[in-house]
């Protein structure tokens, strides 16, 4: 008889860590680059244009012996019904038999994965002497991106937090983000950088060695001329 593991959001939050997420993302990238993993075409459907939709993202990893999918549903009217606007659910299957293996709340997995993906990119692409990070975006993903970046780049000393669309909210958002970052890093050395609200997006961009973004922007908000260029 097939055993199906079912984990809700609280259980996943208690089990998953930043180091685990970083290792998983690195392994996924490595397997994809060598043909051992693949992403399949995304399915997108609008129930009501601009008001309700879903997307299905799927793929496989031979190294884990699994294939799976994540179904994300967005119903914009849900908050008025005291329901979340977003629902995310992941299903995993045995790649050899097709047997279902896990039913997971995809919310926290997405948070950790997104943070790890940004940080892994910075780990391999940033200069070794990078000391300053700009986090452009102050939503739910920001603490995970910052925490993962600090884990992957222990030389970082300063983190600027900016809300590109509402700069006046940056300070309050930063104050809320700091304890979340500290909690995420508590089990892996703690937070070693000063996290402060950006004086302005432009100023912080000019001073930063690494920039991570997580916003719903539909138009560019960072110009190339703002990016810091090392004198070396």
Q: What feature does the model see in each segment?
A:
Residues 154-184:
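NAD(P)-binding Rossmann-fold cofactor-contacting core
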Residues 118, 130-150, 163-165:
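Glycine-rich adenosine-cofactor-binding loop
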Residues 218-227:
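Rossmann-fold NAD(P) dinucleotide-binding segment
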Residues 228-232:
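Conserved small/polar residues in nucleotide/adenosyl-binding loops
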Residues 191-207, 224:
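Short acidic low-complexity segments
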Residues 1-111, 117-119, 126-129:
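N-terminal ligand-binding/catalytic initiation module
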